[in-house]
């Protein structure tokens, strides 16, 4: 059975970047856009799992994003 790893993209309103929270050993991501986050995550997760967790046959990765912003009244 394949192990499922979890990656969450969290918006840091102070720094204005997306940052990662994850159970993938060694994974640290910080990007300006969610599209950049996803693209980088797809590359780095594979590398981090191979280098730090000995995963070479593949794994499942569940990822989510979460952010909060202030909405000004119209």
What annotation goes with each model-predicted range?
Residues 3, 23-25:
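Short strand-coil-strand connectors
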Residues 10-23:
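Short aromatic-glycine-(Arg/Gly/Cys) micro-motifs in beta-strand/loop hairpins
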Residues 1-10, 35, 39-74:
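Short, charged, surface-exposed hinge/linker loops at domain edges
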Residues 25-36:
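A short, exposed loop/beta-hairpin motif centered on an aromatic-Gly-Thr core
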């Amino acid at each position: 059975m394949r192990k499922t790893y979890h990656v969450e993209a969290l918006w840091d309103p102070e720094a204005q970047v997306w940052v990662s929270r994850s159970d993938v050993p060694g994974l640290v991501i910080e990007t300006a856009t969610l599209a950049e986050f996803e693209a980088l995550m797809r590359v780095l997760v594979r590398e981090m799992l191979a280098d730090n967790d000995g995963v070479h046959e593949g794994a499942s990765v569940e990822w989510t994003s979460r952010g909060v912003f202030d909405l000004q009244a119209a």
